[in-house]
Amino acid sequence: MQDLSMEARLAELESRLAFQEITIEELNVTVTAHEMEMAKLRDHLRLLTEKLKASQPSNIASQAEETPPPHY
């Protein structure tokens, strides 16, 4: 009787392991797709930032152009 119980437990564990492996593979595919999408979005953000900087001159004076405060 104990052998049957042990076999049933082993079969249940094998079944769970199989489902976990499938789930892990699905999650891996999802994570990989998200990483690729994030890389594309970073590239787009970098390009947009460069375009924005190139199209608008800064209204903020550089440190060398800035006059010192009156207490100096």
UniProtKB/Swiss-Prot annotation:
It comes from the Bacteria. Gene3D superfamilies: 1.20.5.300. Residues 55-65 have a biased composition (Polar residues). It holds the Pfam family SlyX. Residues 52-72 are annotated as: Disordered. Belongs to the SlyX family. This is Protein SlyX.
